[in-house]
């Protein structure tokens, strides 16, 4: 079938053609960027925490005098350990998806002439890495001598565990064991590498630094107090957490229990990504509504043109055009309109992405989203025009030629 007659017919209906093409262009721009944003949200929700989430709970206390930190830790650990089902209790500064407790800029040289990034750190007492379920991939876990008293925020010259991602960032292609890095006046020596340990408060700027963390073994006391890691069997954990809140009221009645942060790690993760799930749902709804409106627009225009061209269709049928010819005519016509809209929509999609990058720090839109969006809209256009096209192909030649 020749394209020229179809283009000539479209030129006679320029306004309607342009409106549908613009609608498709808008749908293409929104579809590509919305799908990209949904993919980013889903990707962020799949971040690997590196800890045994189903077995861990977190208790956070405040409102106590730092002078009683050692006594408070002892009382709380004893009270929580007495709960049936609790396997171990450890002092820790925070957990993944919990309150942000520690971040620091680090350098590879003591002079700090060049910053090597801002990372988050965890601190915990003896047995904490094992209770967290960290997967060691190189080196060894901290031994008893590595758990030193705090000298300010950190012990003196601590021996630390770092994540594989941070090791690759600091020393790409090198063995990180025995390497040192600095933060202010403290230097840290790497004794082990773990597969994963997510930062406490994951942000939406990308996953590049989501695993830039290190673990500092330390003796509880001072700044390392008031936050506790509970390790229990997954089937007992919810019951244990209820009992733990009640136990705190008995063993430490004068402190404030942070009920917002004191939950299982699984719950903290679920709550942390609640906004992402809601936003993904909203974007899916926007996409569905936009595609529905676009499809209805195509159906409406095609139905109008079929009604308007009944006499022309009948004449073509009378001079030998088959139903297949009529069907293909409307399908090709739709394909041309949709293609024009897609070409403009790809430019709009790129421009919209630049705006989102500037104002919302969204990453650059990968190019493969454009052909995916085009295929979706081509398919939608063909499905939308199919009903009116079949009705046009079913018009009897005699009836059509008699209609005015």
Give, region by region, the residue ranges found by the protein language model:
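Membrane-helix entry/capping segments
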Residues: 1, 8, 12, 16, ...
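C-terminal membrane-exit region of the final transmembrane helix in multipass inner-membrane proteins
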Residues: 2-3, 374-404
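Intracellular coupling helices
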Residues: 4-11, 15, 296-337, 394-403
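Hydrophobic alpha-helical transmembrane segments of multi-pass inner-membrane transport and secretion
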Residues: 12-39, 275-311, 339-340, 344, ...
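Mid-to-C-terminal secondary-structure elements
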Residues: 82-88, 94-272
């Amino acid at each position: 079938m020749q394209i020229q007659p179809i283009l000539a017919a479209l030129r006679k209906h320029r306004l309607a053609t342009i409106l549908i093409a613009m609608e498709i262009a808008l749908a293409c721009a929104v579809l590509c960027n919305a799908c990209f944003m949904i993919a980013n949200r889903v990707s962020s929700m799949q971040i690997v925490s590196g800890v045994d989430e189903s077995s861990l709970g977190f208790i956070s206390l405040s409102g106590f005098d730092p002078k009683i930190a050692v006594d408070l830790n002892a009382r709380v650990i004893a009270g929580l350990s007495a709960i049936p089902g609790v396997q171990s209790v450890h002092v820790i500064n925070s957990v993944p998806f919990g309150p942000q407790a520690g971040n620091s800029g680090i350098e590879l040289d003591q002079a700090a002439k060049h910053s090597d990034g801002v990372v988050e750190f965890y601190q915990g007492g003896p047995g904490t890495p094992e209770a967290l379920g960290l997967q060691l991939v190189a080196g060894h876990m901290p031994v008893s001598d590595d758990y030193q008293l705090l000298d300010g925020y950190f012990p003196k010259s601590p021996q630390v565990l770092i994540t594989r991602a941070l090791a690759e960032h600091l020393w790409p292609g090198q063995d990180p064991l025995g390497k040192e890095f600095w933060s202010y006046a403290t230097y840290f020596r790497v004794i082990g590498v773990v597969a994963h340990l997510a930062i406490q408060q994951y942000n939406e700027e990308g996953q590049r630094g989501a695993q830039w963390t290190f673990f500092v073994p330390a003796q509880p006391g001072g700044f390392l107090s008031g936050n506790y890691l509970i390790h229990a069997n997954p089937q007992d954990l919810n019951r244990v957490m209820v009992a733990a809140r009640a136990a705190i009221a008995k063993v430490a009645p004068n402190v404030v229990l942070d009920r917002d942060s004191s939950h299982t790690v699984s719950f903290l993760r679920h709550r942390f990504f609640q906004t992402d799930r809601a936003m993904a749902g909203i974007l899916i709804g926007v996409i569905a509504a936009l595609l529905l409106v676009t499809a209805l627009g195509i159906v409406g225009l095609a139905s109008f043109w079929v009604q308007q061209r009944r006499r022309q269709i009948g004449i073509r049928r009378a001079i030998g055009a088959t139903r297949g010819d009529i069907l293909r005519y409307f399908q090709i016509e739709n394909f041309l309109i949709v293609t024009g809209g897609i070409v403009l929509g790809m430019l709009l999609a790129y421009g919209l992405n630049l705006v989102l990058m500037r104002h919302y720090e969204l990453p650059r839109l990968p190019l493969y989203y454009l052909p995916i969006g085009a295929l979706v809209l081509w398919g939608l256009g063909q499905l939308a025009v199919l009903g009116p096209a079949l009705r046009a192909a079913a018009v009897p030649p005699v009836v059509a030629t008699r209609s005015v």
